[in-house]
Curated annotation (Swiss-Prot):
PANTHER family: ADENOSYLCOBINAMIDE-GDP RIBAZOLETRANSFERASE. One of its GO terms (molecular function) is adenosylcobinamide-GDP ribazoletransferase activity. Joins adenosylcobinamide-GDP and alpha-ribazole to generate adenosylcobalamin (Ado-cobalamin). Also synthesizes adenosylcobalamin 5'-phosphate from adenosylcobinamide-GDP and alpha-ribazole 5'-phosphate. This is Adenosylcobinamide-GDP ribazoletransferase. Belongs to the CobS family. GO terms for biological process: cobalamin biosynthetic process. It is an enzyme of class 2 (transferase). The gene is cobS. It catalyses: alpha-ribazole + adenosylcob(III)inamide-GDP = adenosylcob(III)alamin + GMP + H(+); alpha-ribazole 5'-phosphate + adenosylcob(III)inamide-GDP = adenosylcob(III)alamin 5'-phosphate + GMP + H(+). Its EC number is 2.7.8.26. The keyword Transferase applies.
């Protein structure tokens, strides 16, 4: 149990801006093997990030005047909260992949471009479009009129968004681990943003990772119907399968940036699936 907590805190330290310092950092410890093992808690980071996003959305819905644009403003600031909390870690991967694969059809040249820390035209477009998709879908979910059952009071539609944010951040962080399991790592580990993390994962590690996801889905079912969650997860899985095929064809494997891209695309797909099912 203590090892479980250490690995989780190491993942928190690595994937978020939350400080794990001083005596706590000494207790957690560090080694390349521990960092690799902490990858199974990738979905668990979604508990924190998604929780912060949901709290921001709910707070602004409560404090702001009730207008047509309130869900849009709340969605925008909840997205800002997630970007700040993660340091744009996954968005950076999306931009690098867009620059690399958009800038060259040659595999080696694409990998070289992806190592460049500068953001190009393709990366900028991908970032803007991804953020717009997130905000638009969350605002749409927040503006859905919740239809009550006979004899029940009208439901608070913001719970849709809070449940979507929390669950979407968890599920979308579990699916990239399937990519680690199925594809070889083709990046330069010495300079990879994920370092020894983006290497390999066992079936047992996947089981731990998906226990986070299944637990989140079980709790989310209190706010969302099962069919909503099934469709949302279905969209995310389809996005994952598409990216697996795409990266296998273009790169013959994955890099740390590909994992960040997968998280972003699967998160958007989750919100889209949820919106379609409501």
């Amino acid at each position: 149990m203590l090892q479980f907590i250490r690995h989780y805190l190491l993942a928190v330290q690595f994937f978020t801006r939350i400080p794990v310092t001083g005596r706590l950092a000494d207790w957690v410890g560090y080694s390349p093997g521990m960092l690799r093992a902490s990858a199974v808690h990738f979905p668990g980071i979604g508990v924190v990030v998604g929780g912060a996003a949901a709290a921001m959305f709910a707070l602004l819905q409560l404090l702001l005047p009730d207008t047509t644009f309130t869900p849009l403003v709340a969605a925008a600031f909840s997205t800002v909260a997630t970007v700040w909390l993660t340091g744009g870690f996954h968005e950076d991967g999306l931009a690098d992949v867009a620059d690399g694969l958009g800038g060259s059809y040659d595999r080696e040249r694409a990998l070289e471009i992806m190592k460049d820390s500068r953001v190009g035209a393709f990366g900028a477009m991908a970032l803007v479009l991804a953020l717009l998709c997130k905000v638009a879908l969350l605002a749409l979910l927040g503006s859905v009129e919740a239809v009550p059952e006979a004899g029940e009071a009208p439901a608070f539609s913001s719970w849709y968004v809070c449940a979507a944010l929390w669950t979407g951040h968890i599920v979308s962080r579990g699916l990239p681990l399937v990519m680690i399991w199925r594809l070889p790592h083709v990046g330069d580990i010495a300079i990879s943003k994920s370092k020894p993390l983006a290497d390999q994962i066992s079936a047992g590690g996947l089981a731990i990772a998906f226990s986070w996801c299944f637990g989140a889905l079980a709790l989310a079912s209190l706010a969302l119907d099962a069919i909503n969650l099934i469709v949302a997860c279905g969209f995310s899985v389809l996005a994952l399968l598409g990216l697996l095929r795409f990266f296998r064809r273009r790169l013959q494997g994955f890099t740390g940036d590909c994992l960040g891209t997968t998280q972003q695309v699967c998160e958007i797909a989750f919100y889209l699936g949820l919106a379609v099912s409501l």
